[in-house]
C-alpha cells in the first residue's frame, strides 16, 4: 500500500485538546464518527471573528457588517468549491445534517410525494435519515421501503434495482454508514433512481470529513453534511440541492432575512439561498467550517483516505486477534474508518467505561441506528472510529484496554 503523505505528529500538534491525560493516561480519542476535534486554525478564525468583526450580515452598510457578510458568503463559496456544486445558490447553511434532511423531507417531500408513492431507504441509516421519511410517509400515506443488505452489511446492485421502481419518488441513503463503515455507491444508486424519475437525497455526514466530494460526478439531487464531524464547529451543517429543485421548493422556516417583501397579510420570499436561511444565520460557524475545509484540503483527501485505510486495517487485524470479539460490517479493506464491535459477555457500555479508565474514548449504544441493531440481532455495540490525528499508538492503547477489560470480566470472584 502506498504511504500517506502527511506527518501525523505535526497534525496532532494542531489539536490542543489531545494534549491531555484522561484518568492519568494519554488521551486516545477514537470517537470522531460522533464528533471530531477542532484544530487551532479553526479556533483562531472563530476567535478572530468575535474579536474583530462580529456583526450581522447582508443588510448592514457599516464596516463590521460588510466584513461579516464577506466572511459568511466566502464560506459559502468555499463549500461550493469543496463539493463541486455549479452554483452558490445550491449551498444552504443549516444547523446540521439532521436539519438539512428534515428540510428536504418537509419542503420537497410534502410537495412531491402523494398517496401510494414509495420512499426507499436502507436499514443501515442513522435515525436522522429514517424518521423524517417515516413521518413523510405517514403524512402522505406513502410506503416506506428498505433495500435489503448483504450479510456483510453492504448493498447488492440487483437488490437496489428490484427495490427502486416507477412508484419511487425519493431514495434516501447514507454515503457511509456511521455504524458499519459501509461505503455506498451513490453514483450508481443515483443513476437507478433517476431512471425511474425519482430523486436521491444523500446523508453525507460520514463521507464529507474523509473523501473528496463531487456533486457533478455523483449527480445527487440533495446532499447533507455537518461541520462538527469534519474539524469544524458544532451547530453548522450544509444542504446541497440542485438549483432547479430548490427554486421550486417552499421554505419551512419564516422570519428575518428570508423575505423579499412583507405586508400585513402576505409575504414573498428572497432568492436562493437566502429563502432557506431564516433569522440570523450561523455566521461564525460557517466561517469556521470553511477554515476546516481548507485545513483538510491542505492535507489532501487522497492522503487522508490512504492513512485512515492503513489505520483501520491495522486496528481491524489487531482487534480480530482478541478472542471473543465480534466485528460487524464489511471486510477490512472495504470499509471506512469505523469499527463497530462487541466483546463476548461484556455489555458495550461496560466496555466503553472500562477502556475510558485507560484513556481511550469510544462510543457505546445503538448509535442512533436501532433498526440496524435489530438487523444485527444486538441491542447495542461499541464503536471505535479513526481520523487524521489518530495513530497506531492509539490503536495499541485500545487493544491493551480491551484485553484488560476481557480479563477483568472473565475473572471469577
UniProtKB/Swiss-Prot annotation:
One Pfam family, short name: Aminotran_5
Keyword flag Transferase: yes
GO molecular function: cysteine desulfurase activity; pyridoxal phosphate binding
Signal sequence region: none
EC number(s) from the headed UniProt entry: 2.8.1.7
SUPFAM superfamilies: PLP-dependent transferases
Key words of the record: Pyridoxal phosphate, Transferase
GO biological process: cysteine metabolic process
Protein's name in the database: Probable cysteine desulfurase
Organism, as annotated: Staphylococcus aureus (strain COL)
